[in-house]
Design a protein with these regions (language model features):
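Amphipathic coiled-coil/heptad-repeat helices and related helical stalk/stem segments
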Residues: 100, 123, 147, 177-178
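Short acidic loop-to-helix transition motifs that present clustered carboxylates
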Residues: 121-123, 144-149, 169
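Short secondary-structure boundary/hinge segments and terminal tails
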Residues: 18-20, 149, 171-172
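Aromatic/His-enriched, Gly/Pro-containing loop or helix-boundary segments
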Residues: 2-3, 174
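His/Asp/Glu-enriched, well-ordered alpha-helical/loop segment
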Residues: 113, 152-186
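Polyanionic/metal-chelating signatures
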Residues: 3-140
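Short hydrophobic/aromatic-enriched beta-strand-loop microsegments
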Residues: 136-143, 160-165
């Protein structure tokens, strides 16, 4: 019997890194450990980000990425490395174990869903293009205030948007949000 309220939680890493880390899906039940709360057979997820957060965090330290183009370039370089890692793993070739590359290889094999923190329509479209180039699936764009601009593209690719109903304009990449966004994307 469900009486409403929150029944399931997806816990994701933050949005400072292009590749933030894995998520976990939990049932909102009393348990002594996280393992006791895990939602049975829930798909695994990977949090990614684009836009201002990664470029601000790394660019302010004089590191890559420091621009939006840099975000995409580092993403592409990383997916190329992941594909090579995946090919060697599939061929049974010996290589140094790399947990990050294992995660990305699992994304490329469809075992892990991608959740991308991305506000702007142009960046979402670029991420979709990259996902097609490397053969992975983007499940959801989070904070995607410009989803309404590419609702048809999102629909064609089976991608969800996790949106706020009435919060936008609080930073540069959120300026083009509109209150009608959710009905336009639905």
């Amino acid at each position: 019997l469900a009486n409403g309220g929150v029944t399931t939680l997806q816990i994701l890493p933050g949005s400072a890194n292009l590749f933030g880390g894995r998520s976990v899906t939990l049932k909102n039940v009393p348990a002594r450990t996280m393992q006791g709360m895990k939602f049975p057979d829930a798909p695994q997820g990977l949090k990614m980000a684009c836009g201002e957060n990664p470029k601000r965090v790394y660019g302010s330290k004089g590191r890559e990425p420091s621009t939006r183009m840099g975000n995409m370039a580092v993403n592409r370089q990383t997916w190329i490395k992941a594909r090579e890692y995946q090919k060697k793993r599939a061929a049974g070739k010996e290589q140094t174990r790399d947990l990050g590359m294992e995660t990305l290889a699992d994304v490329l094999e469809g075992k892990i869903m991608v959740h991308n923190h991305c506000y702007r329509a142009d960046e979402m479209a670029n991420v979709i293009d990259m996902s097609k180039e490397f053969g992975y699936k983007v499940s959801t764009f989070h904070h995607a205030v410009e989803s309404y601009k590419i609702a048809d593209l999102l629909r064609e690719n089976g991608i969800c948007s996790a949106l706020w109903g009435d919060w936008y304009g609080f930073k540069m990449e959120a300026y083009d949000g509109i209150k009608e966004s959710i009905p336009l994307v639905h």
